[in-house]
Amino acid sequence: MAEERKPDEILNAILAGSEDKSIPELLKEMPNEKLIKSFYYMESIPEVTQMRVLQDILKSAQNSEFGKKMGFAELKSVDDFRNKLPISDYSQVEAEIEKLKAGTGDILFDGATASFIATSGSTGIPKLIPESKNGQLVKGLVSQIRAILLLMLAPEVMAAGKKVLAIANPSEYGRTAGGIAIGSASGQAAKDMPTEMLKKMVLPPAMMMAKEVSNEATDYLTIRYALAEKNLVGVVCSNIAHFNILLKKMNAQAAELLADIRTGQISASITIDPSLREKLVSELVADPERAAELETILENKKTLDVAAIWPDFAVVSCWMSASAAKIVADIKKQLPQTVKFLEWGYGASEGKFNIPDKAQDPAGLPALFGYFFEFLPVGATHNQTVLVHELEKGCYYELIITSYSGLYRYNMKDIVYVTEINNQLPRLVFVCKESEKLQVQQLQLRVYEIDGAIQTISDRLNHEIRFYQVLLDQENNKLIFMLEPYSERFDSDSFRVSLEQHLAEINPSYQQLRVAQQLWPAELIVVRDGYRDSLFTRSIMPGKNVNQTKLKTIVSEYPDSSSIVDWAKEGEK
């Protein structure tokens, strides 16, 4: 495609700088084909693109309160920028964000705040991330490019009559005291879908945009619409665990669902707003033929099997990296082998940072046109960052972003891994939060190191693991690994011994603490089948759902006794 990626007049304007339009505004004007060509061309010259994006971001905020304070108009180089502004986090912009929430403009960027995005609230108190007009455009463009590339990788989605199930969160939760909308990152992504994709959605707009619907009702309605549609070709969501749970609920509630499909109704047992119920039911059609077909499948197979109920099911787009990788591996066992898995894309409330363009690959190209990226090598004892074109393959970095929405040298406290580099352009994958690590004196084990160790032993002993968590019992100075294996024949003693030996081999600090008896032998708890899925329903924060829920890998509590199948300890059989 090199011939197709040459710059044209608009790209020259982007690279030279436009007096009256930002880079996101120029890109938004492009038709899909030109947008994709422009995206790939800008990716091919990462150093030039990133310099232009930084200049454009600073220009769009130079008249703001913060921009004047920091002298954005005088910053002429990357070094000027890095020398002037320290690396920051949410606490350092919280006061400015409070002003933005009240409706005050020209604080962190020029103009008014377009919206706020609520974080997942893992601490119990969601943070609100401001969004400028340009910041909204960037997220919309990333979603647009992701959708276009998804369709290029899975053209069967656009076949006539085929439908897609998109599991998203509400695009708007409420408003701030200043009257500014508060939404979710995945809900906004659903709004940003291209029109041709929205027409493919199996869920009606009235349901996708509905507010204050319980998780139970949302799940039932999602299954009800999906099950009624024989031509479902794929599912798009962030957390594939949600789809996995929906499949289980589908079988548990089969009789009720089939009755609704047969009569064109919504069960009276499902509590929803009467006006929403009336709106949805008015558009439903009784389908006794589909109900009979599903009844036959259920009778013959004793389950509503994906391949049988949706014969054309071919595509899943979801998170595939970090803790989601094992969930993807699990659900693949329930789907036809021909199903393509496409990465949903790495992002957060603060931004959408990469654009996947390969099937079965969790990594993606950095969204160079929308953010200025810096990277802090993991383990560095200094704050000296490297830029996109300076990254090294096989290395781990903390991600530092500068955005059009008022985040400057903002530490995402995310760790990303460089899977490959092609002509200075890296492919990045999210691996864990910086805080996800175990520390005992001089020992430090990050989640990706623990995951690698468990995977190594799993492969060596041919014991596949569906899910795991680990805790540090500080009172007794020992690591406790909690594993949910696939097989009932799992040998917990041999797995524990092999894991203990492997940790000592790969981490000298672990070996030293064990020899000095400052850390006692690791223990392994085998938890019952279905433990992971039960955690999802128990871990949902108020106002959230499974799609927005991530399970912690490092925990502080033992599982309840009813969940424990076996407990392997040194010297015990």
Describe every region a protein language model picked out.
Residues 2-73, 81, 85, 96, ...:
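Active-site glycine/GP-rich loop and adjacent strand/helix microenvironment
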Residues 52-56, 60-116, 131, 138, ...:
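Active-site diphosphate/adenylate-binding microenvironment
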Residues 67, 127-130, 150-164, 256-260, ...:
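Short secondary-structure capping/junction motifs at helix and strand boundaries
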Residues 101-105, 125-133, 204-207, 228:
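Short acidic, glycine/Ser/Thr-rich loop/turn "cap" segments at secondary-structure junctions
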Residues 116-130, 246:
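Conserved adenylation A10 loop of the ANL superfamily
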Residues 122, 149, 249, 253:
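Mid-sequence acidic-hydrophobic segments that form the walls
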Residues 130, 135-140, 341, 347-349:
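Long, hydrophobic, well-ordered secondary-structure blocks that form the structural core
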Residues 134, 151-152, 156-197:
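Active-site cavity-forming subdomains of large catalytic enzyme subunits
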